[in-house]
């Protein structure tokens, strides 16, 4: 009789565990769906705040609101689903506990009256012990909810840690002395999508001190090529070398000290104007800052600001126009006077007068051994360079001196008109 009574809680313990694991998968999946919905809501909110003017001007507010409502309903449905499965698991667990208790009492009473193989005290002890065995099982549903959310958090963290980083796979990046800064690229390919390459260049050589312009149609990969030369993007195929050393092997700090990169889209950071001008640079004096401001014309804006270099810039730099932000970024790029200057559409947001001033300043500022690579669509920018590379979706179409390339382009245009 005692063996039978002892077997009852074991059987119901196994049944409770089976039910718990059945609902575990459902709770885990619902928790993942809930977290994904929350992430999407957060992403939509940030995107809306950053583009509120575009949304207003295009009348897309209703669409954004509908998307928000849909994501909110999805998140609510996921939370309801989690609660439903959690409650179901709780109900089954409590049900098994009650059945177990009733079964032990009933079979125990029958055993006492019929065979007397156990005493009343033993029956009471068995019911107490069985309750203590099954009581922790009732906590399983809440544990499964936490388990599902924890697994998703760990999965997200793992995906972040698995993202490629600077010097991927290199334990000790190199910090060699670069007596020259010749740039070479061989068989490089890069694609933002797996099935489509944004750029495909078989061979490219830029020697120290060359002044090079990269031309091409929209979407042919000019900006992407510049980012790979800056060491910001790793080619999906091929290699980019600096002085004969693969950039992936060179310490990021050394690249930052050697290469100055001005992106096409200018971003300012929250802080003072001074902070933005010397962002990431060490040991820059006020004299260097003022000199660079005079060269770019930023000194005019600086003198109009009541706090000068201590002017607070809000997040995103929205208090400045596009042209002003571009001048600030260009000033930042030339302050360090680095050996390689990479400019992506450096005058795109400037008026004609400011553009002429900037081009003239750069022509006088660039020293003989300083390498310049500029991406542009504007003919005036070509006055700074002595070599032009024309890029297409298939790779480099034309590469030569400025006079040779411009003559070929002119000839091709005349043939096309004819």
Identify the function of each model-found stretch:
Residues 33-81:
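Loop segments that connect adjacent transmembrane helices in multi-pass transporters
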Residues 335-339:
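A short, proline-enriched helix->beta-strand linker immediately N-terminal to the Walker B motif
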Residues 230:
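Helix-to-loop junction immediately C-terminal to a conserved catalytic motif
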Residues 13-15, 86-100, 120-142:
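Hydrophobic alpha-helical segments in the permease module
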Residues 37, 41, 57-60, 84, ...:
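Cytosolic ends of transmembrane helices, especially the final helix of ABC transmembrane type-1 domains
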Residues 1-33, 106-118, 135:
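Transmembrane helices of ABC transporter permease
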Residues 341-345:
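Catalytic Walker B motif of ABC-type/P-loop ATPase nucleotide-binding domains
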Residues 159, 241, 249, 256, ...:
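ABC ATPase nucleotide-binding domain helical subdomain, centered on the C-loop/LSGGQ "ABC signature"
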């Amino acid at each position: 009789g005692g063996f039978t009574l002892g077997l009852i809680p074991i059987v119901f313990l196994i049944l409770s565990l089976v039910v718990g694991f059945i609902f575990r998968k459902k709770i885990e999946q619902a928790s993942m769906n809930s977290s994904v919905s929350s992430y999407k809501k957060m992403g939509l909110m940030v995107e809306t705040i950053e583009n509120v003017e575009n949304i207003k001007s295009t009348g897309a507010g209703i669409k954004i609101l509908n998307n928000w409502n849909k994501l909110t309903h999805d998140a609510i449905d996921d939370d309801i689903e989690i609660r439903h499965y959690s409650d179901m698991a709780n109900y089954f667990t409590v049900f098994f506990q009650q059945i177990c208790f009733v079964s032990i009492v009933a079979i125990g009473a029958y055993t006492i009256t019929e065979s007397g193989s156990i005493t009343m005290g033993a029956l009471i002890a068995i019911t107490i012990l069985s309750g203590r065995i099954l009581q922790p099982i009732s906590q399983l549903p809440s544990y499964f909810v936490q388990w599902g959310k924890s697994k998703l958090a760990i999965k997200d963290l793992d995906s972040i840690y698995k993202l490629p980083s600077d010097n991927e796979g290199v334990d000790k990046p190199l910090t060699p002395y670069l007596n020259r800064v010749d740039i070479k690229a061989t068989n490089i390919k890069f694609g933002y999508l797996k099935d489509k390459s944004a750029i495909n260049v078989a061979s490219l050589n830029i020697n120290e001190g060359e002044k090079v312009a990269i031309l091409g149609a929209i979407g042919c990969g000019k900006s992407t090529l510049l980012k790979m030369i800056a060491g910001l993007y790793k080619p999906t195929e091929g290699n980019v070398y600096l002085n004969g050393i693969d950039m992936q092997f060179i310490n990021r700090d050394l690249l930052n000290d050697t290469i100055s990169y001005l992106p096409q889209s200018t971003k300012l950071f929250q802080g003072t104007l001074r902070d933005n001008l010397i962002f990431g640079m060490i040991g820059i004096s006020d004299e260097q800052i003022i000199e660079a401001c005079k060269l770019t014309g930023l000194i005019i804006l600086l003198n109009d600001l009541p706090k000068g270099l201590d002017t607070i810039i809000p997040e995103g730099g929205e208090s400045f126009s596009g042209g002003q932000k571009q001048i600030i970024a260009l000033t930042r790029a030339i302050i360090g006077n680095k050996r390689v200057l990479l400019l992506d559409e450096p005058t795109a947001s400037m008026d004609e007068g400011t553009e002429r001033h900037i081009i003239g300043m750069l022509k006088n500022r660039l020293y003989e051994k300083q390498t310049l690579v500029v991406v542009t669509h504007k003919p005036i920018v070509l006055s700074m360079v002595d070599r032009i590379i024309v890029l297409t979706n298939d790779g480099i179409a034309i590469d030569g001196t400025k006079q040779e390339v411009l003559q070929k382009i002119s000839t091709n245009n005349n043939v096309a008109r004819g």
